[in-house]
Amino acid sequence: MYEIRKIHSNEVMEALALALEVFLQFEAPDYKPEGIETFKRDIVENDEFISKCQQGICPYAAFDKGKMIGIIGMYSNRKHINLAFTKKEYHRQGVATSIFQYLLADILKDAPKLHEITLNSSPYGKPFYLHIGFKPQSDEQEIDGIRFTPMKYTI
């Protein structure tokens, strides 16, 4: 079993490094160079995003023996997932599903009337999101080189 919790402010850069590592392995091959640069600029190198994380609007993460192995982040409104990555060697072992279940329970403690969570799924992540109950809301789109399908999870 993995430890699942919100990351601490001193773990933000580790989480972003994990996101970039997994993005480059699994997402980048399907993206134009513009999309790769957009991801880096908007997430990994975004000082505002990093600052918010360090102030407590942090991703949730799974740890195996103290090592961060997966993350799921949300915007501060806690209604939209903005990143989800699991290290390659932990794919298909329930890591991301466990993080999602934990964050959903955590959110519902504070917002019991929340009725949906949204995200923009990458092509690589779409089968996972379908598996845990997200439904596509439109066809795949591309903005600034980032390919995504808007999806919604109804609670």
Which residues are covered by each model-predicted region?
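Conserved GNAT acetyl-CoA-binding A-motif
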Residues: 107-121
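Short alpha-helical
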Residues: 10, 14, 76, 123-127
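Short, well-ordered beta-strand micro-motif
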Residues: 61-63, 150-154
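Acetyl-CoA-dependent GNAT
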Residues: 9, 17-83, 87-88, 100-102, ...
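Conserved glycine-rich acetyl-CoA-binding loop
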Residues: 67, 83, 87-101, 122-127, ...
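Conserved catalytic-core motifs of GNAT/GCN5-like acyltransferases
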Residues: 118-120, 130, 135-150
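Conserved N-terminal entry element of GNAT/NAT acetyltransferase domains
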Residues: 1-13, 154
